[in-house]
Amino acid sequence: MKSIKGIALIAVSILLTIYAWASAGMTNFIVPGLALTTLSLTFLLATRNALLEKWFHGIEKMYTYHKFTAIFSVVLLALHNVAMGGSLWGSHVAAQLGNVGIYLFVSIVLVAYLGKHIKYEAWRWIHRFVYLAYIFGLFHAYMLMGGRLLTPTLLGIVVGFYAIIGLVSGFYIIFLYQSLAFRHLGKIMQVKRLNHDTVELKIQLSQKLDYQYGQFAFVKIFQEGFEKAPHPFSISGGHDNIVYFTIKNSGDHTKKLYDKIQEGTKVSIDRAYGHMILDQGQEKQIWIAGGIGITPFISYIRENPNLNRPVSFYYAYTGAENAVYLDLLKDYAAKNPQFDLHLVDSKVSGYLDFKNYPLDNQTTVFMCGPVKMMDKLADEFKKTNPKADLVYEGFKFGNYIPVYTNHKV
């Protein structure tokens, strides 16, 4: 399990919190104490920290556990009064701060689940009230406990440590991330519409973007009428200070981008993310792309004109009008005998099928495309070879939270 370090971080934090409250003889405060710790971890997991991304083996796993700790925190807060046994320690102000914090958290959870019905920018700002609720919760805890949490005991150190993590992480996310993380400034040099719904952007950056074939990055677009929030797009190539992104019209933002993006527009880019690294597979590889899922494979093809390994590439699409880069793929196959190209138009030959495919243990299968398609193909591969080396990713916005589905089987 590649995310074992990240899981261990959460588990150790929970166990340490339980032990700290129990050793202080305050077992009835364990549940609210755990809520503060898991809320701190919720903020920490939203920072997109590079080390944490490695520990969780991908930002997609970080978002999964971010959601888990957030929901777990709300459940703990809902049980707060029960765990306290109805005791009313501290001042009336402390109790009111705690109530306000809980109401805010519950409201924000409801907003998160209704997120698909409101604009992303509005959802994003509403979600920031979590930080305010967290501060109310900390004031509630410290006012309630008097000086117990301010002494250099195990309990005071543990609660203070996670409080600092939560406060610093939340402050960074809300006030610093947008300005500090997007260090790669650039300008759109070329807008190329590949078909009726897919556009390719060629961007010149002020400094080189370090990335690996198969990764994606968050991009901010500074053009009137566009959201200021960053959006994730797959990298489709680049060298030196040039980087390419290929984007499909699949929502409000990408539709506007396809219709109205202009050459000369300024952009800023965060670092590269993702763990579907084509260079990390075995010598023999099978690549499977569905629709816009071709993008990460194009990044490899563009920057490696001479293929030095056997690759069977299956590109699935529905109608030639929806396909992209067909000429590039055909030219690449003509120049590289080891590149076995299969173009699969579902209108002509039906959907891609790998039932009874003889997959050996010396081959890595990389897949990128619709999640349902990849899950189906993965099941087919595993039926013939339970030890199949499969790596697949698919990007979506789940309730406007960027989620990367990444599986290493």
Go through each PLM region and give its residues:
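Membrane-anchoring hydrophobic segments
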Residues: 1-79
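FNR/FR-type flavoprotein reductase catalytic core
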Residues: 3-13, 65-175, 241, 250-409
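Extended boundary segments
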Residues: 19-26, 113, 156-181, 209-230
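Long, contiguous hydrophobic alpha-helical segments, chiefly transmembrane helices and signal peptides
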Residues: 39, 44-45, 56-57, 62, ...
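Residue-level signal for pocket-adjacent positions within structured domains
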Residues: 47, 57, 230, 271-273, ...
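A cytosolic-side transmembrane-helix exit/cap motif
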Residues: 52-56, 145-151, 175-184
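Ferredoxin-reductase
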Residues: 180-268, 310, 317-319, 330, ...
